[in-house]
């Protein structure tokens, strides 16, 4: 699969960038940066929505949650303080989030829309 991981900065991936990458065979985007698309909106603007409709788009709050999860892990009582335990915990959380999203709809597209739907339901 052709994979793109925008990780350097926020709001830099334009509609033209996405269209050019899709034309070159892009299949998956895993957002490493917070808010990587050049939308005014922080959550699910028009560029992100169009991209989500065309490729497998893993949203930043899943693919970029590693350090946030590490902090949450250390807030728990009596955790193992090893690299392996921390990595396994973050991997398990990310894996569960992806699996929940897939269980809602197994399509290769609209992953971010489904992930936001799940996250918002958990908050309300």
Locate each region found by the language model.
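Activation/maturation switch segments at domain boundaries
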Residues: 11-19, 23-26
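Adenosine-phosphate binding glycine-rich loop
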Residues: 22-124
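Rossmann-like NAD(P)-binding element
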Residues: 1-15, 31
């Amino acid at each position: 699969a052709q994979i793109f991981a925008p990780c350097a900065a926020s709001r830099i991936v334009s509609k033209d960038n996405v269209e050019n990458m899709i034309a070159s065979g892009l299949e998956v985007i895993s957002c490493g940066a917070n808010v990587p698309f050049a939308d005014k909106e922080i959550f699910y603007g028009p560029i992100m929505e169009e991209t989500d409709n065309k490729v497998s788009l893993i949203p930043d709050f899943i693919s970029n949650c590693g350090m946030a999860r590490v902090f949450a892990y250390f807030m728990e009582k009596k955790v193992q303080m090893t690299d392996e335990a921390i990595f396994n915990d973050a991997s398990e959380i990310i894996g569960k989030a992806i699996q929940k999203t897939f269980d809602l709809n197994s399509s290769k597209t609209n992953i971010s829309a489904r992930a936001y739907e799940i996250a918002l339901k958990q908050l309300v």
